[in-house]
Amino acid sequence: MCGRYATVRGAGDLSAFFDAADETDGLLAPDYNVAPTDPVPVVRLTTRPPGAPRAAAGTGGAAPAGPPRRVLSLVRWGLVPHWAKDPRAGARMINARSEGVATSATYRRYFGTHRCLVPAEGWFEWKGRGRPYFMTGGAGGPLVFAGLWAAHPAVPGGLTCTILTTAAVGPLAGVHDRMPLLLPRDRWADWLAGPASPALLAPPPPESVAALEIRPVGPAVGDVRNDGPDLVARVSAPAAGEPPATLF
């Protein structure tokens, strides 16, 4: 699973990188230790015209529909289905297995029409109960996870999301058996706007995984109260039998 990750880029950088209108209202701040129910940036499509009330997005508002456009939104991590009576259920829905979203009673609606891009510097995993690792792409643009979003009136801000996971490959499988479904740039448009099909859920291409670094980090990330760049800094080399620091 992906239960902790880092997102540190500013709204201006992200909106430019994804060619998306910024709707985070200056509230997006770096977070090196994103935990369930935290606010996170996502890129999604809306047909709400610029300047129309945001309550119209995904909630049946009366604003006239316009052409789809990308927006950078701040949403709560942990999807709360529109029919949920208790929004606290979202804390358990931070991940969705990609193998089942097309048929799941919970997720198939959102897979059909509410897909989003989730930018991240990388994600954390623990090898068993031992050392934490930070999986990152290093320099360049952020990693992009496949996500789903939902609107719910009882959630602050109104929007929530989940991150899709897939089977881990290569040395990543030596840390955890699951990984986020990574989307290279040439899959963004189809993920956001293409018809729902199994092809959207294809594993990440080998070159996307080959570029990742498996970085041993310190134990402080285990406490959700901790934050800051030290959490993603490399620590001493892993002990014998642990995964190497890099994939290749």
Stretches found by the model and what they are:
Residues 1-248:
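Short linear sequence motif anchored by a di-proline
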